[in-house]
């Protein structure tokens, strides 16, 4: 699905042009947090932001929001052995800020969101989509700023996203893979 305003194309599966070692990261529907933890000695979450904010046009479209409709944003870096490996951005529309999502959102702190999402059997994940996100997308620049010079970004980042549903309400989670992700060991045998 092409979104002309941002230039990215979200796909159900990564194209052949995606680096082979990155494909499992883009397609595994299990917890990204758990996958990273299995491949590093020390794992951490650096919360960059957890507040109301503006959405990109494709985030609004995916969540069925009108321009100007408010949402809570959570932006974090996932850190493996001291190196940022993923920039993640979660979006919760203001109208969805009730019940289970609101309790989860308020109580998450610096814990990984993935651990909470995958531990609640009531939460259902919709299919993953992936895209190559470049400088035309505001989220690329958010990731670059979050790194604060700790790493140089390539011209584009591979990302994946999906919507999680709880009692008919939606939470969008997008994960942008930073170059250091390829420094983690391959899948254990």
Swiss-Prot record:
Gene Ontology cellular component annotations, sorted alphabetically: cytosol
GO biological process: pyruvate biosynthetic process; ubiquinone biosynthetic process
Subcellular location: Cytoplasm
GO molecular function (one): chorismate lyase activity
Pfam family, one: Chor_lyase
Catalytic activity of the protein: chorismate = 4-hydroxybenzoate + pyruvate
Pathways involved: Cofactor biosynthesis; ubiquinone biosynthesis
Key words, A-Z: Cytoplasm, Lyase, Pyruvate, Ubiquinone biosynthesis
InterPro entries xrefs: Chorismate--pyruvate_lyase, Chorismate_lyase_/UTRA_dom_sf
First-level EC class: lyase
Residues reported to bind substrate: 74, 113, 175
E.C. code: 4.1.3.40
Coarse class of the protein's main subcellular location: cytoplasm
Superkingdom as given in the UniProt entry: Bacteria
UniProt similarity note: Belongs to the UbiC family.
Protein function: Removes the pyruvyl group from chorismate, with concomitant aromatization of the ring, to provide 4-hydroxybenzoate (4HB) for the ubiquinone pathway.
HAMAP family (alphabetical): UbiC
Name of the protein in question: Probable chorismate pyruvate-lyase
């Amino acid at each position: 699905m092409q979104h002309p305003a941002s230039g990215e194309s979200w796909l159900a599966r990564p194209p052949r042009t995606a680096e082979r070692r990155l494909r499992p990261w883009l397609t595994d529907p299990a917890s990204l947090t758990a996958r990273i933890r299995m491949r590093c000695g020390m794992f951490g979450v650096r919360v960059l932001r957890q507040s109301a904010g503006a959405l990109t046009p494709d985030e609004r479209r995916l969540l069925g929001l009108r321009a100007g409709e408010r949402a809570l944003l959570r932006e974090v870096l996932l850190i493996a052995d001291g190196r940022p490996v993923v920039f993640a951005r979660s979006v919760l529309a203001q109208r969805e800020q009730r019940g289970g999502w609101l309790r989860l959102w308020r109580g998450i702190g610096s814990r990984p969101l993935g651990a909470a999402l995958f531990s609640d059997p009531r939460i259902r994940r919709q299919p993953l989509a992936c895209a190559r996100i470049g400088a035309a997308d505001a989220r690329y620049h958010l990731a670059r700023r979050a790194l604060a010079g700790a790493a140089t970004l390539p011209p584009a980042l591979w990302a994946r996203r999906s919507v999680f549903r709880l009692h008919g309400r939606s939470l969008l989670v997008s994960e942008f893979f930073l170059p250091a992700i390829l420094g983690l060991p391959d899948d254990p045998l």
